[in-house]
Amino acid sequence: MNTFKPLGEALAARQASQHAINFIEGDNNERRQPFSGLFARAAGVLKHFQDCGAAPHDEMIIMVERNEQFIDAFWAGVLGNIVLVPVAPGSTDEHRAKFFRILAKLQRPCLCTDAATSARLNNYAAANGLAEDLKKLE
């Protein structure tokens, strides 16, 4: 049995395997992602994170709608030694308020989100006097 210290090593070691993650979205929509493709995608997402300024030990809020986006961002963070803070995007103002409470507690935050969630966060911030708080992410 292999033992891996960093979790990212486990994914890297399984690139040649036939194992995969199955994403099921709805009754007739299923997609299989082999570990080799997952590693390549995560490495690409990590490069994007790094190009945007994320560094090891930074805190990355992952707030995305789709499971596939979450898995890619999660493994990118693992590969980059980034502290992951998963937050459900949700559909209510309470979800957005929770995001801002979490953001206030972080020291070096980054945000991985989708366009729709970003728009909802920006609208909520503007309506609730929190626009300045979003500057912490710049």
Which positions does each model-derived feature cover?
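Short acidic/polar active-site loop segments enriched in Thr and Asp
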Residues: 55, 83, 109
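Short beta-strand elements of ligand-binding domains
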Residues: 64, 87-88, 134-138
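Conserved AMP-binding/adenylate-forming core of the ANL superfamily
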Residues: 21-75, 91-100
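A short N-terminal helical cap/helix-turn-helix that marks the beginning
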Residues: 1-22, 40-42
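Conserved ATP-dependent adenylate/AMP-binding module captured primarily in the ANL superfamily
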Residues: 89-125
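Short hydrophobic alpha-helices that are characteristic scaffold elements of the AMP-binding
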Residues: 50, 74-86, 105
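Conserved helix-loop-beta element of the AMP-binding
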Residues: 107, 127-138
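A generic secondary-structure signal
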Residues: 10-13, 48-52, 101-106, 124-128
